[in-house]
Amino acid sequence: MSIHAIKPIKTKKNAESFSSSTEEGQPLSPMARLFHESDSNVYIIVIIGFETRLNPEVIKANLVHTFLKQPRFSCVQVADEKNGGELKWVRAEVDLDNHVKVPTPDPNMESADLYVEDYVSNLSKTRISMSIPMWDLHLLNVKTSDAEAVGILRVHHSLGDGSSLMQLFMSCTRKLSDPESLPSLPFSKKKKPDSSSGGFLQYFINLFSVFLIYWNTLVDVVMFFITTFFLDDTKTPLKGPLGVASTPRRIVHRTLSLEDIKLVKNAMNATINDVMVGITEAALSRNLNRKYGQIKKDAGEAVGSNNLPKNIRLRATHFVNLRPYLAAKEDISEMIKSSSSVKLGNMIGYVLFPFTIGLREDALDYIRSAKATGKRKKATLEAIYTYLMAKFFIKYFGAKWASFPTQTTLWFSNVPGPQEEVTCFGHQVAYVAPTCYGQPNALMIHAVSYVNKMKIIISVDEGVVPDPHQICDDLEESLKMIKNIVIQKGLVD
């Protein structure tokens, strides 16, 4: 199969040149500065599996017309001595040989999957020099169990968040079925208010809804401050110590059936996110029960079917995209018509999301619990508050006062991916698996959809969580168990 360069989408006018960009010479935004702090010096890793071998020269040629059109991918971050040493964007000449790495695989490797896994883990031990734009791309022509080749994109989080990088990635892709067309993202249709009920009753309902949002926000803000100063999660085998942000990571991923997730979603009248949180609660409960059972066994105590301590407090720093247009547009072609039109940045807030840990008699209670908590977290301005507070503290007190919470057990995030099979620079994509390293937690769980698959990515500090593959097994088994119960109870149409 021949590999062709990406075909551009025709637009009414070309994107502005870099000289007219507002990035050059500007200081880094408060959120970008936050990602340079020692306990939040975060890098985004995107592992992309391909159905064909990679052609490095074709990819380099296309990067010139895509990534390098993005100001942040062709800028270095330098200290502005005239402004107290604050970092600012300065344009630089980009030598792609400094950014695109094509290693020669060991011909005697025992396992291609383990080779790629170790390669990514070794990347997490390094940082990108600030003397060049802070991104690189590693092309591994290694056949693994689920791909013919693997690309690994590494980007410092100061360049942009997961949602904006997903837009940039999608601007570099085309539908496999139609090479002239951009792919589409799933989007949420907001329910229209029922106009049949009006008058005083509707006014009262609206007023109560507004009151509820502000009340929930007040409660969440109080909980945020309590957490910041002294409320830590329970010290479980999944909870990392202080300083874990600087440790290397083991990154693994597993593919789940998106159709199975949708089956549970429809049966429980829930959302995809509710189901993902529910199966994660179930999986972490199984995992911790096993670990506590081993602790009891090692101590010579009797091991039962339920070894979990009571009242485990386990919370996730759950990241929320604050770009409202991503949830409102079905056709994103205008947003990603070219790579230069994608607006990179860190428009993210977060909520402190409690996970209910315990062994349930009815596994569907995991979904019900996740649904109830998710509904509660939607009726709050907590994510906007954490975003604005971070900006405020960074602006007036410095980034050291606005670090991400270390009191939670894990980071949790999900990003919707393309609904159709796509090609990237002419190479058919098999999967997309984004995650991070440098975060102040020992465990991160990320989910991203692609066509009819849901990819789960686990990033762990092996010194704290030595069994990331077992967590993947637990997630897979939890989804299977919940799906089977849904079918057995006749909840499927």
Predicted feature descriptions by range:
Residues 2-26, 36, 45-441, 445-476, ...:
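Soluble acyl-CoA-dependent acyltransferase catalytic core bearing the H(X)4D motif
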